[in-house]
Amino acid sequence: MRTAVDTGTIQEYMACLSEKVRRLINAYDMEETREMICEAMKEYPDAAQPHNLLGILMETQGNHVSAMKHFRAAWVLDPTFLPARENMENFGSFSKPGAPAYTMED
């Protein structure tokens, strides 16, 4: 397991992970994306961000049901993590979804 000493802070690690995942999804490298997210989930099982990112990946691959499960898991783990809530609202509506929220800045 990584520690805060290994990676700076958990927040910095998650911010870096989010940006890497965004780039990999945009480059259609789904396998590496999944591996990176799953590793983060193992290292930080209580973090909302990896679930949100896996939800984005699932939605990108057309697996809406799994995507919504991971967005909900992220929201349950951290109700203050707004990207998960935004993605649930965005992808759970009947209108055409907008861009996914990877970070608080999205």
Say what each PLM segment does.
Residues 1-16, 39-42, 98, 103-104:
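TPR-adjacent "capping" and linker segments in tetratricopeptide-repeat scaffold/adaptor proteins
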Residues 14, 48-49, 82-83:
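Helix-start (N-cap) detector for alpha-helical repeat units in TPR-like alpha-solenoids
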